[in-house]
């Protein structure tokens, strides 16, 4: 790390003349940013300093690299080291292992006899991709083929369940919870930043609150987080928020609600109550949430999600790739079959569900401290939801510049300094002397 007691007069690179938005939420300022090796060595007037490379940023914004706190990039960071969907939009750090599914820790062969990973685990690939018995094994694979961006890993609750249970249609036994806790603690010692759940999915829907509390209780001593795709985001949105608050209360774990939203026309407006409950809970605990800037969701093809969707478009299908891009209703009509049969024939499959309200997205996004995240699905290679490639530019353009949901400084803070603080990502998320030089330069 550069010596912070003095300003050098020679740098590897100087980004000159830009409007520095430092990630703290404070006002922008015209300044140069000097870089030595992988760290910011100086911020200020460096017009007289020497540099091996000087980048003219006049008229541009210079910000910390964005941190995408909710991704499913577990496999992409290994197989596509450029990580183009993220690096192309200024993301320099991703948090993997969300919604209860992570590639590690999982002992290969634990689900012998099952052709495909169950439910949401298929979002990360096939059984061949679940080949990392420990988080250390996964990290070694990252080190062997380093991606262009940084990776912080959550441990998926459904992945833990898949490793110790013979089926998902019941609560875990005490012995199974103890086994999961041991694996979780091993992963936390190995650098995992927390535990995630996907309580709306078949792999975890039968997991009671007590099961989650027992596992989340492991987190506090490690300074790790509990993140959750809640049990319901429609008619039972508010009870699901209350369950999340109960888990945080009883476990003592700092908690993040993933992709907070209200789905289904009949449920629009419920964020008034959900946000009120969150605000009240924040007075006594560390509780945050993230949000993505679209009115459509995307995940595996599930009947329960179809019921709250105005329109559903297929994004992937292992068995019928020719149907990708088609509306689900048109596929059912063409095949002359039931909804259940169509799902069975298309699965494993993914879909985009149009089921949110624009005004509500803005309300949730505008809430103080809400973080920005993509929830993109790299496995949908043919017709992915645009959030995979476009989340951060859309927030900066559509919501910040065009609609004034918040200032540019606040937008950058919610994409950088705030998530770095919440997830304990040190020396990233801010432009200051001594911080890593993860930077993005863009036209505001």
Regions found by a protein language model. Name each.
Residues 2-65, 80:
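Histidine-rich, glycine-flanked metal-binding segment
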Residues 18, 38, 59, 70, ...:
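Divalent metal-coordination and catalytic microenvironments
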Residues 22, 74-75, 101-105, 159-162, ...:
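Flexible loop/turn segments at secondary-structure boundaries
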Residues 61-85:
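Di-metal (Zn2+ and/or Mg2+/Mn2+) metal-binding site signature of metallo-dependent hydrolases
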Residues 79-193, 285:
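Divalent-metal coordination cores built from histidine and acidic residues
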Residues 137-138, 143, 171-197, 203-348, ...:
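Histidine/acidic residue-rich metal-binding segments in metalloenzymes
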Residues 249, 305-341, 345, 362-444:
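His/Asp/Glu-enriched, well-ordered alpha-helical/loop segment
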